[in-house]
Amino acid sequence: MSGGLLKALRSDSYVELSEYRDQHFRGDNEEQEKLLKKSCTLYVGNLSFYTTEEQIYELFSKSGDIKKIIMGLDKMKKTACGFCFVEYYSRADAENAMRYINGTRLDDRIIRTDWDAGFKEGRQYGRGRSGGQVRDEYREDYDAGRGGYGKLAQKQ
């Protein structure tokens, strides 16, 4: 049974795919595009390192029934590193999350959602050299919600 608050807002409109494509996708662009168009999985980015799985669930379950949440982890420290994947049971529920949750605030951060071709084991780890996300390696500004200064800026 779905208690999704946003289910009532459902429409027949289609949520467009963004220009972003996973550079590590194993397959060609056509195959990735096909998977993205039928996917029930969202990539959620710009999370605080302190955002919990429970907070993600509370927000994203307003769009429908969630099958699984996979928190992004620093591959060295195994701590949260600012992203996650949210998998819904239905495409319609995932579309509602894209429509209504993308660009909202969570933990004082504007989060972004994007379609994902489907979670595969190993993708929960950051791809940066230090184990976190690549963007956090090069950031020169101070961001308390994402561990302070970027990793490379800290070394200087």
Curated annotation (Swiss-Prot):
Chief place where the protein resides: nucleus
Residues where mRNA binds: 20, 43, 112-116, 123-127, 133-134
Domain RRM: 40-118
GO molecular function: mRNA binding; RNA 7-methylguanosine cap binding; snRNA binding
Pfam families assigned: RRM_1
Region (Disordered): 124-156
Subcellular location: Nucleus; Cytoplasm
Record-level GO cellular component terms: ciliary basal body; cytoplasm; cytosol; nuclear cap binding complex; nucleoplasm; nucleus
Top-rank lineage group of the source organism: Eukaryota
InterPro entries reported in the protein's UniProt record: NCBP2, NCBP2_RRM, Nucleotide-bd_a/b_plait_sf, RBD_domain_sf, RRM_dom
SMART domains: RRM
Gene Ontology biological process: alternative mRNA splicing, via spliceosome; cap-dependent translational initiation; histone mRNA metabolic process; miRNA-mediated post-transcriptional gene silencing; mRNA 3'-end processing; mRNA cis splicing, via spliceosome; mRNA export from nucleus; mRNA splicing, via spliceosome
Sites bearing N-acetylserine, chain numbering: 2
SUPFAM superfamilies: RNA-binding domain, RBD
UniProt modified residues of type Omega-N-methylarginine: 146
Keyword terms of this UniProt record: Acetylation, Cytoplasm, Methylation, mRNA processing, mRNA splicing, mRNA transport, Nonsense-mediated mRNA decay, Nucleus, Phosphoprotein, RNA-binding, RNA-mediated gene silencing, Translation regulation, Transport
Modification sites for Phosphoserine: 13, 18
Basic and acidic residues: bias regions: 134-144
Functional description taken from the UniProt entry: Component of the cap-binding complex (CBC), which binds co-transcriptionally to the 5' cap of pre-mRNAs and is involved in various processes such as pre-mRNA splicing, translation regulation, nonsense-mediated mRNA decay, RNA-mediated gene silencing (RNAi) by microRNAs (miRNAs) and mRNA export. The CBC complex is involved in mRNA export from the nucleus via its interaction with ALYREF/THOC4/ALY, leading to the recruitment of the mRNA export machinery to the 5' end of mRNA and to mRNA export in a 5' to 3' direction through the nuclear pore.
Quaternary structure, from the entry: Component of the nuclear cap-binding complex (CBC), a heterodimer composed of NCBP1/CBP80 and NCBP2/CBP20 that interacts with m7GpppG-capped RNA. Found in a U snRNA export complex with PHAX/RNUXA, NCBP1/CBP80, NCBP2/CBP20, RAN, XPO1 and m7G-capped RNA. Interacts with PHAX/RNUXA, EIF4G1, HNRNPF, HNRNPH1 and ALYREF/THOC4/ALY. Interacts with SRRT/ARS2 and KPNA3.
Similarity comment text for this entry: Belongs to the RRM NCBP2 family.
Record protein name field: Nuclear cap-binding protein subunit 2
Gene field: Ncbp2
